[in-house]
Amino acid sequence: MGESILTVLLFAPLFLVVLLANLADKHRLEGGTAKTIAGLTYAFHLVIFGIMAMVGATLHVIAILMETNDNLQQNFLDLLSGGGTEATEGILPVLDRLDVLGLGLWAPAAAAPLFLLPAVRKQLARLIQIDFRSSVHAIAVSFVMLVVINLTFTLAIGLETLADLSEASEPSIGSLLFSLWVQQILFAVWAMVGIGWLTRRKWGQALERLGLVVPSPAAIAVGIGTGLLSVGVIIVLEIVAQAVGWGLNEDVERLSESLIGPLLGSIPGILTLGLAAGIGEETLFRGALQPRFGLLFTSLLFAVVHSQYGITLSTLAVFIVGLILGLLRMRFNTSTCVIAHASYNITLGMIAYLFPQAF
């Protein structure tokens, strides 16, 4: 429950910024003045990324100081661990990479405001389908830095350390189910608000923009078939990768097992992995982002968001699945993508459930 509350609190300022950005665009498109609301939008944006940049810079400075002062490192370690030996052992690997962690936080955070400049967005508009005058599009492209921060955080701490920390936490199945649904519902609602629901679009218009429709029997069949096909593609990828010496990363397997392994032991857990991720991620990525960011960039973001895989074979697999889902979105609609994504996850989950020795 505590983790879910924290997730909601972290999403709250992001909801506020996209809501204000949509209000600014609404006034602009209606011929009114949007400078005040746009200015307020960008001010909140600067506060969010400014705090991140300051925290990252502080961590970076502390890391530099600790390299020249052993006593400072020990004092900082004692402060964080509370004097416990086990906690100290868990924190020490993080402290060893504190400089990279700080840099990975402040550098993307400092870069994010650059996308608020119309001149920068004019150049981006040559590559992706955005309107450089739009406050919504300005916020959307700048929020890509959140994905970068998420990835650099994973790489800085290291998959091995994350796996160790995750294994030590041992969350209950109930809390995993609840937190996953909360996260994915927030993704879906954020996508709805981001494309103008509550401000520029009514409910039906928002669903139409996102490509969420009542699927036909043919679309359901195509979605399920695409999900099963994607499973086959990824299995072939893993076989080929292992044949050339690029197998699955042991730390990725450990981290995945600790994060979602408990869910694979029950049918409700497997259904949650399929339905929650299908609804939340597809509404955000294929529904909201792909029409503006395009197939390749959206698929890349989709892969990087799954930062628990670091940069490994699993990341490539997610990218390929993202491409398949993106092509499906271009040919059909987001609802079909939801079905395909859910079918893919549920199929993999059932394989792990029925044949645990294969994983």
Question: In which residue ranges do the predicted regions lie?
Answer:
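Membrane-water interface of transmembrane alpha-helices
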Residues: 13-26, 102-125, 190-203
